[in-house]
Amino acid sequence: MSDWQRRHILSLADFSPVEYEMVLRTAAGFAEVLQRRNKKVPTLQGQVVTTLFFEPSTRTRSSFELAAKRLSADTINFAASSSSLSKGETILDTARTYLAMGSDIMVVRHAQAGVPQAIAREMERLGTEVRVLNAGDGQHEHPSQALLDLFTICSVIQPEQPSLGAIAGKKIAIVGDILHSRVARSNIWSLTAAGAEVHLAAPPTLLPPEFAQFANTPIPGSGLPRQLQIHWQLESALENADFVMTLRLQQERMSQSLLPSLREYHREFGLTRDRLRVCQPSVKLLHPGPVNRGVELSSDLMEDESISLIQPQVTNGVAVRMALLYLIGAAVPAAIPA
């Protein structure tokens, strides 16, 4: 796609509305492709997509791998547990190894913030054409998850042609472990750029006041302010909400002192059918997964297809990641379809 200028996708902080629209439009096209009997297209035939996952992942890794294969790319899967990292090899040396194997796109996930950016800088320093896509770095960002969330929400409102304008003015509540969530950070950037009113809700220990500073960064391309509010009680955040996104409690990243107990968290911030009654009647529920049933939300809500968008999120993830791989991969001449 000749209009796409971004080489790497590392953060949504500087994404413009025009770029979001291009992702939505491209993803909608691939979503249609995935409905066909033959779900493969030759768009990235001859390209090599390497998933460098230094952190465990099921959904994201599988989704990117399937997306690459649907685009006819060759894939290489790196697993940190069986790699030379245990023998002292550095992360950048690992990236250079896969560069030497012919990688065109590197999809990078790491428990430390900034690793995808460091690999992207190294690829540029070496004068390569390699593209880097951030699949989640520490508590920093998770761009592809936020973009599939955006696509899912827009698809509910405008099924025929999802567009950014669909959610302008909509109230979207994000509830849960916001402090440790890279998903929350990327969603704040994307949803506020779309003109949605974003309401964050969590106990004070999981939602520092500093999150209000996101609103101080104007939307790229328009310069408009971002609409963001913080709530330390759930009901005010849910009142008249059109969409509610609940986040997993990341116990592996938090100290035990942040919460009295999981039972106490569910009592105050867990989503139940009764609590959703203050939302819009048409409210929809999202969760990036994996879900702690009975903690972040009740099992009956998760399985209620009239409310839950959790399975559509997973389905849409493949189309959105196809779009991202295509957009950055199409800048490589061999990737452009005839």
UniProtKB/Swiss-Prot annotation:
Catalytic activity entry: carbamoyl phosphate + L-aspartate = N-carbamoyl-L-aspartate + phosphate + H(+)
Q: Could you state one GO biological process linked to this protein? A: 'de novo' pyrimidine nucleobase biosynthetic process
Residue positions binding L-aspartate: 87, 182, 248
Can you name one GO molecular function term for this protein?
Answer: amino acid binding
Q: What is its EC number?
A: 2.1.3.2
Signal peptide feature range:
none
Q: Which domain of life is it from?
A: Bacteria
A Pfam family it matches? OTCace_N
Q: Which GO terms describe its cellular component?
A: cytosol
- Which keywords label this protein? Pyrimidine biosynthesis, Transferase
Among SUPFAM superfamilies, the record links this protein to: Aspartate/ornithine carbamoyltransferase
Listed binding positions for carbamoyl phosphate are 59-60, 109, 142, 145, 289-290
Alphabetized Gene3D superfamilies for the sequence: Aspartate/ornithine carbamoyltransferase
> What pathway does this protein act in?
Pyrimidine metabolism; UMP biosynthesis via de novo pathway; (S)-dihydroorotate from bicarbonate: step 2/3
Role this protein plays: Catalyzes the condensation of carbamoyl phosphate and aspartate to form carbamoyl aspartate and inorganic phosphate, the committed step in the de novo pyrimidine nucleotide biosynthesis pathway.
> What family is it from?
Belongs to the aspartate/ornithine carbamoyltransferase superfamily. ATCase family.
Q: How does it assemble?
A: Heterododecamer (2C3:3R2) of six catalytic PyrB chains organized as two trimers (C3), and six regulatory PyrI chains organized as three dimers (R2).
Instruction: Name it.
Output: Aspartate carbamoyltransferase catalytic subunit
* Protein encoded by which gene: pyrB
